[in-house]
A protein has these predicted regions:
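Active-site hotspot residues in diverse enzymes, especially metal/ion-binding acidic/histidine motifs
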Residues: 1-276
Length: 276
């Protein structure tokens, strides 16, 4: 069996998968509703943290090492989430949803691992020989970005028969466009929905590069989520703090503390990168 399929939570531990599905359904009901998230995931992370009494800053920065998707840490009670914007947008979205699970475990599950930091790499996202919480985070991310009921509904709307490999690829591309899931995650989602068999999933996974190249060449369905954005919102965050001070939404003391904390965090990230 394909290593990715073998190690995904759905195949590795079906009971634990069902538990994560319950958590995802409850979370969706409370914080998402009937919406399809796509790139609204970033504001959902902020909403969840703030509703639970935590300050949060999401940095969207280009990082040279594309194996790093995202990392999260806590400094002086503030949650910092950094997303690598040199990646395709659908990977950024998945990374944010993945990190949200670690934040959820910290806030609702008394998991203190975030104090030391959480990092999502290309290997973690591929579910190959990773810790159980990483598998859970990947499953959670896919479940909130593409809830099973909505996937089944969109599959029905697409009205694409899955009686051939070509049609399966068309269906996968259509659903990738709907939910902004990376290709591999979408294939596993189809398996979870019993829309495809394991053999079909293995074949689809083997065609990842060819399918993504096809999508980009046609600039059609799914292409918007495969673009690398290279966003950098660090200066925007600093300006927002200064503007909040000018508008007297926060005190001068709070603004200074926030800017100091921001600079300390970025300095610590620079040191960590240099050490690597």
């Amino acid at each position: 069996m394909n290593k990715l399929l073998e190690n995904c939570l759905f195949e590795k531990d079906s009971q634990r998968y069902e538990k994560i599905k319950e958590i995802a359904i409850s979370f969706t009901k409370e914080y998402i509703g009937n919406n399809i998230l796509c790139d609204h995931i970033f504001s959902t992370v902020e909403t969840y943290c703030r509703r639970n009494g935590f300050d949060v800053q999401i940095f969207r920065l280009p990082i040279e090492d594309e194996k790093i998707w995202a990392f999260t840490s806590i400094k002086k009670g503030c949650i910092f989430v950094t997303i690598n914007t040199s990646l395709e947008l659908n990977k950024q979205i998945f990374a944010a949803a993945h990190e949200l699970y670690h934040i959820y475990c910290y806030i609702d599950g008394d998991d203190n691992d975030l104090v030391n930091g959480s990092i999502l790499t290309d290997e973690n996202a591929g579910d190959i020989d990773v810790a159980m919480e990483e598998r859970e985070a990947n499953a959670f991310a896919a479940l909130i970005l593409a809830p099973l009921k909505q996937v089944v509904q969109q599959k029905k709307i697409a009205d694409v028969d899955s009686d051939s490999v070509a049609k399966l690829i068309i269906l996968t591309i259509y659903l990738m466009d709907c939910f902004a899931l990376p290709y591999k995650a979408m294939v596993i989602k189809l398996l979870e929905c019993n829309a495809i068999q394991k053999a079909e999933a293995e074949y689809l996974l083997s065609e990842e590069k060819n399918v993504e190249a096809f999508i980009l060449s046609r600039e059609g369905l799914g292409s918007r989520w495969l673009k690398k954005t290279n966003d950098n919102n660090l200066n925007a965050i600093k300006e927002m703090i200064k503007k909040n001070l000018q508008e007297q939404y926060i005190s001068e003391e709070k603004a200074k503390a926030d800017l100091k904390l921001l600079n300390e965090f970025m300095s610590s990230m620079t040191k960590k990168k240099n050490q690597e």
